[in-house]
UniProtKB/Swiss-Prot annotation:
Binding site for Mn(2+) 2: E80, D108
Complexes and interactors: Influenza RNA polymerase is composed of three subunits: PB1, PB2 and PA. Interacts (via C-terminus) with PB1 (via N-terminus).
Similarity section: Belongs to the influenza viruses PA family.
A Pfam family this chain is assigned to: Flu_PA
Name of the protein described by the UniProt record: Polymerase acidic protein
Name of the top EC class for this enzyme: hydrolase
One Gene Ontology cellular component: host cell nucleus
GO molecular-function terms, A-Z: endonuclease activity; metal ion binding; RNA binding
Gene Ontology process terms (BP): cap snatching; DNA-templated transcription; symbiont-mediated suppression of host gene expression; symbiont-mediated suppression of host mRNA transcription via inhibition of RNA polymerase II activity; viral RNA genome replication; viral translational frameshifting
Amino acid sequence: MEDFVRQCFNPMIVELAEKAMKEYGEDPKIETNKFAAICTHLEVCFMYSDFHFIDERGESIIVESGDPNALLKHRFEIIEGRDRTMAWTVVNSICNTTGVEKPKFLPDLYDYKENRFIEIGVTRREVHIYYLEKANKIKSEKTHIHIFSFTGEEMATKADYTLDEESRARIKTRLFTIRQEMASRGLWDSFRQSERGEETIEERFEITGTMRRLADQSLPPNFSSLENFRAYVDGFEPNGCIEGKLSQMSKEVNARIEPFLKTTPRPLRLPDGPPCSQRSKFLLMDALKLSIEDPSHEGEGIPLYDAIKCMKTFFGWKEPNIIKPHEKGINPNYLLAWKQVLAELQDIENEEKIPKTKNMKKTSQLKWALGENMAPEKVDFEDCKDISDLKQYDSDEPEPRSLASWIQSEFNKACELTDSSWIELDEIGEDIAPIEHIASMRRNYFTAEVSHCRATEYIMKGVYINTALLNASCAAMDDFQVIPMISKCRTKEGRRKTNLYGFIIKGRSHLRNDTDVVNFVSMEFSLTDPRLEPHKWEKYCVLEIGDMLLRTAIGQVSRPMFLYVRTNGTSKIKMKWGMEMRRCLLQSLQQIESMIEAESSVKEKDMTKEFFENKSETWPIGESPKGVEEGSIGKVCRTLLAKSVFNSLYASPQLEGFSAESRKLLLIVQALRDNLEPGTFDLGGLYEAIEECLINDPWVLLNASWFNSFLTHALK
């Protein structure tokens, strides 16, 4: 390549290129591709200015050979190819005489006709990519950019190409010739691939005054001045050996960079112990609804009226009894609480005018269930700071739990379709700008895929319950208010439907801080027999409260109806997030959009329609022990939505930690799959950080087991 450069380019250009490389400490004999690139760039700059003059009338003219006495001025000032000091002197003098803004970086030319600096680019890649890099680097409206490629393409600011067609054709022909000459010598491929992106070397700006003093004070040890530190940092080779750099930086650091190979990662260790239990604020797949279609009763829309109406649709009530006690609780109190709800609802009906809200009598069973008077008495810190052995009371370490199969079933169920629609089209928000046509189309397609999804039912149920509970907590702080758990949907035929899942009774709720807790007792209908998976229902007391007739293929069958009762709690901040669960729709829509964008940029046109309507295509959904699971685009939408919804329903510090730490390992594995030869240090520490979050949370444990499946298949 070096020989080729010396043969192919004018000796003056070769000499300038060598000088420029030496100024930056680069060797033309070693970095031969760079040598060729600099020569090419210089030649293009010279050709750009050749033969272009300005005559005495100030008009731009082209003179190839002519009267040497004519009063002509060169149209372009060449800045490229001068040494830096000289180049900046020229730029400064141009700025002083013309009043043009001084550029941050050294440009290549100055155009006296258009009164602007020009940055010339010659690229072996796509012109628009290189153009954007240049524009991002110089960030100046004033400097004109003109990019040429070896394939005859060009791009210039505002499509203003400055020169006439013929002058530009000369440059393109020359570039094409260089390319052919290189190719015939087998040099082109290496030259084409060696082009790096634009590097940004900002011109140094001076730091003075207070900032300068602060900078000098905040230097690491052993550095006398900011200059001295800067020089040290600039000496870091980006691809030098990292270990040496780390040990240079600090005596304490002795990281050895280990290559990360297919055999390096081990699976995450999931905890042993009893199976994990359900911890969501309301039942998910096990919930049962009592529903009314086309509600038109008096007071329709008032939760208590709706609830009573729904209760009346069921005729199979019977004397309740406990069939799965709560290990630690006083179970008869749960039974009495349910009986009290039934009795007080009955009382309401006997009244002349049904009230809009109902506060329960403060019976001993409710006081117990809601933890009334259970909180330790608060003592002013001033009164006890002299006590010598004052300490926070010990809390037990959480008991490790193992992954149970129910959480995967819950997730699968959340991805399924129900026979009702849970959101209207406008649930995701209206268009703001007219350009949103494609966005609307995507949103409508997406809504169609997820409106019937069970995860969407969970969103609407969560929004309703959290809104109602937060309202009641503020409006009736001292009361044990009954809050019906309600949702609304539309049937296949488009008929409105109101559903009742059960009731919540809230405890005292003087919530001053975001994290202050309000206790509540939830009572939820279900057809699930708790004895099938008793570990899932550890925190519940389950009653049998009736028999329900179900229509099946073989006719009507009677099934026992259960009531799942438990004490629970939440806080203002959790209710605030619960009320905003609709955001899950937006998050998963954005994930789908980025998939469509990726497709569209490959095909260079908007692929929204094809993406949703090509039913034959399958997409990767996730990893399971069987391998990569695939499904239709609708299934992908629903799976992404379910993940987002479960992140909200099962939000916890364990999930935060696991997501943040496992992401690091995921990125390393992906780098390995992309053959980027990643290196790591203290991989053991990363594993520790991830596994510290695997304690007892069902959703985190499930994600960890998915992560292990991913590791297995990614590294095959």
